[in-house]
Amino acid sequence: MISFFGKCVNNLYKSIYYLVTGRSRVSHVLAQAAAISYDSLLISLVIAFVSAAVIAIQVSKQFLMSGAEAYVGGSIAVVMIREIAPGFVALAIGARAGTAISAEIANMQVTSQVDAIKTLKVEPVGYYFAPRILAAAITVPMVVLIAELVGITGGLLVSNATIHLHPARYINSVWLWLSARDIYISLLKGFVFGVLIALVCATQGYETKGGAKDVGESTTKAAVLSTVYMLIADFLINLIFYL
């Protein structure tokens, strides 16, 4: 785990240097942005909506029984923005796009395509990693923001349908409870999670040796490692900003 973390840090440094020196093409970044976030947008929004709906079902009647139904909107908004949207979106993108990144680079490694890039005097880590890391860092926070809006809307619809909470009271509660700081931190989480998904999965794919069987094993390991690193990062961010 420690040696793998060191490889990730080294690959991140090479990728940043590759980007700073202007060797990464915009077309490559846009293609990776579409593959990483756009293709995962629908499933991310569905997860956000369903998650908010489940939370609304669980808390609405409890709040109603205690006469605190006016706080339903704020509670759902805070939970969605602080934790559910960034975490679930990152897990969805990691499961879909992260494993695809790992499988693609692992396949290139075992079929000697990476060696072919080296013969052209191109830095393979920068060439393969930089567009993916930049695309994930930019687009994952965007998906998180959209998921937050969808989740809050889902909570509104469910609370209105279950306890007949007026939308105005729901929205007023959201405005009272929500702060710009929470939104900024959720976007920071999206940025960090995006970088980790691309970096960890690409590194795992790049370290693959052997044949087709090893590609499959590497892809599975990439999904596990990216999830572990995201959970650790989530804990540290919460520890820094909310303790």
PLM features: residue spans?
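Short, membrane-interfacial amphipathic segments enriched in basic
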Residues: 1-27, 204-205, 209
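Selective transmembrane-helix segments that form parts of the transport pathway or gating/packing helices
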Residues: 37, 41, 45, 84, ...
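Membrane-interfacial helix-loop-helix connectors in multipass membrane proteins
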Residues: 58-81, 148-191, 195, 199-219, ...
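Short cytoplasmic-facing helical segments at TM-TM junctions of multi-pass membrane proteins
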Residues: 105-130, 212-215
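Final/C-terminal transmembrane alpha-helix of multipass membrane proteins
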Residues: 215, 221-238
